[in-house]
Amino acid sequence: MASTDDPAGQRPSRAEAIVAHAEQSISEDAIVAAARERAVDIGAGAVTPAVGALLSVLARLTEAKAVVEVGTGAGVSGLWLLSGMREDGVLTTIDVEPEHQRIAKQAFIEAGIGPSRTRLISGRAQEVLTRLADESYDLVFIDGDPADQPQFVVEGVRLLRPGGAIVVHRAALGGRAGDAAANDAEVSAVREAARLIAEDERLTPVLVPLGDGLLVAARD
């Protein structure tokens, strides 16, 4: 009898196998793993290991000194971002849940990250982003409510310095964003965010099939 790879008796598609291999190839240290466990405990989303590793690579490639993150969670993505940033880099991370930020702050302390390297802002990202300075950030990571992605993208692009990059997580919505039959409000918002990026001549975008889809765009 031929072996199968899931309880339903169906082998994963080639694309699924590649993504699974990408995820399994990343090992997380004990501090990130502990933060991931806390994220589960408090019901906060957390990027997958491969998404985290890509964030670290992008931070390194952009030589990021100033990074903005929408959606602190338990600090998993923040730890990955900080691992790729310059040693004097500062992560500004925004979340509407103060408890999430308290837990993330503990993760940063456990990782030996000094308080001068993080700026945790509790509040609605829609409001906080508007108060940040134009063209002052090397990398913007958006991991907030997909329904708010268009506004986050508009503000995020405004914050980017030339040569910086914007990363939008949950750009695929489990495949619904590419399903012509799907047209609910969340899908429409994600498509609008993608359109805004695609039509901005300063940006060079690519959709990366990791996590729930990462829309990455570099600014000229």
From Swiss-Prot:
SUPFAM superfamilies documented for this protein: S-adenosyl-L-methionine-dependent methyltransferases (SSF53335)
Binding locations of substrate = D143
Q: Which Pfam families match?
A: Methyltransf_3
Positions binding S-adenosyl-L-methionine in this chain are: V47, E69, G71, T72, S77, D95, V96, D145
Query: What does the record give as EC number?
Result: 2.1.1.-
**Sorted alphabetically, which CDD domains does this protein's record hold?**
AdoMet_MTases (cd02440)
Does the keyword Magnesium feature in the UniProt annotation? Answer: no
Q: What is this protein called?
A: Putative O-methyltransferase Mjls_4009
